[in-house]
Amino acid sequence: MTDVSSPAGGAASPVEMTTSSSPAATTSASSSKPLTNGANKTTISTTAGGVAPGDVPGTGSGAIPASSSSGNQVKLEHHHRQSNNNRPAATNRSSETKLRSPAGESDGASRLMTPAGSSSSPSQSPSQTQASIQTQTSQQDRLTKASTTASQQDVDEVARLFEEKPEAFEKWLTERAPPEALSRLQEFIENRKPHKRPSVTSDLFQQWMAASPTVQQKSPRSLSNSSASSLPECRRHLMDLDEGELFMELIRDVANELDIDVLCHKILVNVGLLTHADRGSLFLAKGTPTNKYLVAKLFDVTQKTALKDAVARASAEEIIIPFGIGIAGMVAQTKQMINIKEAYKDARFNCEIDLKTGYKTNAILCMPICNYEGDIIGVAQIINKTNGCMEFDEHDVEIFRRYLTFCGIGIQNAQLFEMSVQEYRRNQILLNLARSIFEEQNNLECLVTKIMTEARELLKCERCSVFLVDLDCCEASHLEKIIEKPNQPATRAIKSADSFEEKKMRNRFTVLFELGGEYQAANVSRPSVSELSSSTLAQIAQFVATTGQTVNICDVIEWVRDHNQIRAEDEIDSTQAILCMPIMNAQKKVIGVAQLINKANGVPFTDSDASIFEAFAIFCGLGIHNTQMYENACKLMAKQKVALECLSYHATASQDQTEKLTQDVIAEAESYNLYSFTFTDFELVDDDTCRAVLRMFMQCNLVSQFQIPYDVLCRWVLSVRKNYRPVKYHNWRHALNVAQTMFAMLKTGKMERFMTDLEILGLLVACLCHDLDHRGTNNAFQTKTESPLAILYTTSTMEHHHFDQCVMILNSEGNNIFQTGFAGLGAGTFGSGRGTGGGSNSNFPGDRVLQIARRTIFFFVPELDAEDDVVDSVVDSVVELSVVVLVLDSVLVAALSPEDYRSVMKTVESAILSTDLAMYFKKRNAFLELVENGEFDWQGEEKKDLLCGMMMTACDVSAIAKPWEVQHKVAKLVADEFFDQGDLEKLQLNTQPVAMMDRERKDELPKMQVGFIDVICLPLYRVLCDTFPWITPLYEGTLENRRNWQDLAEKVEMGLTWIDHDTIDKPVEEFAACADEEIKDIEFTVTTLNCNQQSQHGSEDSHTPEHQRSGSRLSMKKTGALGKAVRSKLSKTLYNSMDGSKPKTSLKLLESHVSEDMDDKSPTSPSQPQASGSMGRMSASSSTSSAGGQMVDKSKKRSKLCALL
């Protein structure tokens, strides 16, 4: 319908006005143009192919002639689609155009019916209607220009208002806009959106899959025909058409048919109509390229045979004809048409069908059906003419050939569509199987039964069996092997040299799943060896499991006869076809065999069946493997639980140690030097280290603040110490130093004012636990060796392990200092408070309970003696009821709430992970940005996390800020641990370690220490002391140690080898500074310049400056040459000493000690000249030493100092 109207205001109609001599104007039936004049509104609508109710039907072309005031005619033409059938033109092109007013309009509206001269609406005459149209047209012509201008001004004004006040426009839309305007606006918006091209194929496929099987067997055309008229009427209608029209009509009938059954039925019926054949059959090609055969899709179909009957007959008795057998078989093999006039005279004709049905076959026309590539996809056969002719003539052959050409395209399309439907259903089944794998992963029997049921229903077989192989992968040890080496298969490949019997013994079946008919339940059994050996089906499955090959058997008896390995004793007469396929796991190891027995229709299993069954086998393997892995994982989890229980027992400190520590006197913090940044643990024994930790907790008021039971705290400290390995550096002593530095930063550095008590508790715990169970190797080594820790934690490997060990200790019985709820208060707990001496444990809550108990006793029994033993026994009794006493005295154990527990554990985890230098580099820039912006409020969660992370790193590397006598010893320990890792990398990984871990480059340690200080330590301490000036000693100590390391690095560069053994000995400065100590265990190798010449011409060179003397300087460096900077520095030193200036103290002391030591041990005469001073003595002594080759006492540890003078 086309509505033509104009807006109020007199806009001209956009309908084209043409004169009678001009070409007719056409307007599409889908266009919509409004046309109004004042209060009147006229609608012009056109409909094609029918008459509206109440209208008078008209004839003609369907145009609407209407005269205007100027004598023009309004002509609206429309186009409609012609009908598929060849109807007369007058019938197919009938149309009408009507002008009507919408409901509710005034009486001025009119309705016109076409053609001209027909009766008009009952309310108006034709002349009145024509006058109305002329009036509207003239008014539109006069007001077109003014209306257009006013409309544009209105648009501009409204647009300006909307732009200035969009809120008002939105409010008007939501509150006062007419519904019609909103619907038009919504329609306009929808039309502006980009639309996807409609997929006809997808819609058709979805409609097909949603339809019922009954509807799918019938095409839409057949449904409409069956409802409209009977078959004889359709036949009479087709007979009225000429041959060309009939041929095209029949082609259109099969062109869009996608159901293969309906298509074949239509082909046979239509061929009967075209050739006047009595009945026909259609065969489709099946089978493999080497074994092809024809299957009768529909057989003996007449023009009166219904589709349902034809399909039922073909399904009940399936006819299979091999290529080359019979008339149809010869046509399929030769691709040549066969036209037989007398069937019984042809030797290829099989008269058995005629004998069964009583029908006599005379003439036969059989023709191949090929696809676009020329391959045979079917054979069509028609028999006996119905028009009195006794044979099929050339005209019938030509029509048959032409029609089958189009039918070949339709058949192939239908087959492709059928394959798509089958693939779709197959995918749905496989998705259901995948879903079942996750649903039934804890029940292997249910999973296998569900898979077998789906396979049996899809492949239409009689029986289905699954044999499971007894493998090592069924044991938990297999999963452990996979975890140890995830990139290597844990299964052992079968060697080709193994015999069949040896392979067979390794693949022994342990479980058998059997599923019979449709209504039979699954049977699960564990067959014995004798049962397996006597069963042919089990032997075939054993053959498949051993060889790993898929077996598709058409004749079981013949196959068993051809394979001598099968020695079965049971009867196999009922077994016709077997499809047997191996089931493999993720490691490509056969874990079972799936077996299908006998298709329901008696035919062998095809390649398509094997392909579908392969998918079932894959999903079955995944499900079985997944279920077995789940069972193994459960076993391993149980093992892990037992191992953790054992580990927790052995990792926890003993009760004797705990009781001893609880009874020990805890000295004051000053006696341990805990407040100082120069703290050292060298003088502390192991028990003192634990006491120092307890004192730090007490001084931070954590014991009383969180009411930590004292025996729990002591046991936890001892357990933490016990879980550190005896490595050279990352041991319990290192954890103690880190915790002490944190304590000093909190107390001396006044950082506690930025932290809550809960955060202080978390930081101290994190410091003590940050290297738990350290193995002396870093994260990179764990990743390179693919250790279980690297598999468990992909990032910050060791740090995550340290935190997990911390949690393990806390979760151990009697070690949870973060325990929630009321803490357990026993007699042992409070008894530990007695005898601590001097009130050193004043923060211990047990003392409060004991005081309450004693006051209560003497209040009620004042005559008791305070020293009486009765008092002690009564006190012990009161302690047993301490909970009641605490309630009465309002002293409840305020242990951590669940929220506080989560908070402190989060602090501990974040702090321990922050000790990874990779995390430090990630957080450093954000922290520097906050400091540079002058941040002073550190109470935000993110800012507090950054601050705690920087403090943990500062404490972790705080050994670099210790006094020099402490720092260089710690550096030796770190270097030794690194060198051990480097040795492991050479031994296990066969790789060259980095310089800091290479024992052969240990001389570079001072230089590497300087680099470590410059890159990590100094920037960190600088920014911390700039923000928190109370921790400046860390920065100053680091600067001092950097100067020492730099000085030592320069001397090593000059040729001083300060390391000569696997363990690092004292540096040069330590000996140089000890002027009063006698040096006994150092071997000196002194090289002078031209010693022989000097002994002969001493007077000659006595006045020559050292730096101008000829000769080469011999260095003890490996390269044998000194750098330019070293030569310059050495020359200046020697020149200044010869000029009488005071040399450096270290060199002077060194020279004196060397000369005295060499003089005492040298066999030279005492009358040797001494005028040359210390240098002369050094030269003489050195030459004598070199000549004599004397050695220092071998029983002492020896180090080598090479001094170049």
From Swiss-Prot:
Q: Which reaction does it catalyse?
A: 3',5'-cyclic GMP + H2O = GMP + H(+)
Its GO biological process terms?
Answer: cGMP metabolic process; signal transduction
| Active site positions | 730
Q: Which InterPro entries match?
A: GAF, GAF-like_dom_sf, HD/PDEase_dom, PDEase, PDEase_catalytic_dom, PDEase_catalytic_dom_sf, PDEase_CS
EC number, as in UniProt: 3.1.4.35
Q: Where does a divalent metal cation 2 bind?
A: 771
Q: Which cofactor does it need?
A: a divalent metal cation
Ranges annotated as biased composition (Basic residues): 1195-1205
Q: What does the entry list as the binding residues for a divalent metal cation 1?
A: 734, 770-771, 956
What's the name of the protein?
cGMP-specific 3',5'-cyclic phosphodiesterase
Q: Where is the lipid attached (S-farnesyl cysteine)?
A: 1202
- Give start and end of each PDEase domain: 654-1052
Cysteine methyl ester: which positions carry it?
1202
Q: Which CDD domains match?
A: HDc (cd00077)
Specify the enzyme's EC class, one word. Answer: hydrolase
Q: Which gene encodes it?
A: Pde6
The record's family statement is: Belongs to the cyclic nucleotide phosphodiesterase family.
The keyword Hydrolase is assigned to this record? yes
Provide this UniProt record's keywords sorted from A to Z.
Cell membrane, cGMP, Hydrolase, Lipoprotein, Membrane, Metal-binding, Methylation, Prenylation, Repeat
Q: How does it sit in the membrane?
A: Lipid-anchor
Primary site of residence: membrane
Q: How is the cofactor bound?
A: Binds 2 divalent metal cations per subunit. Site 1 may preferentially bind zinc ions, while site 2 has a preference for magnesium and/or manganese ions.
Q: Locate the compositionally biased regions of type Basic and acidic residues.
A: 1098-1109, 1152-1162
Q: Which residues form the propeptide?
A: 1203-1205
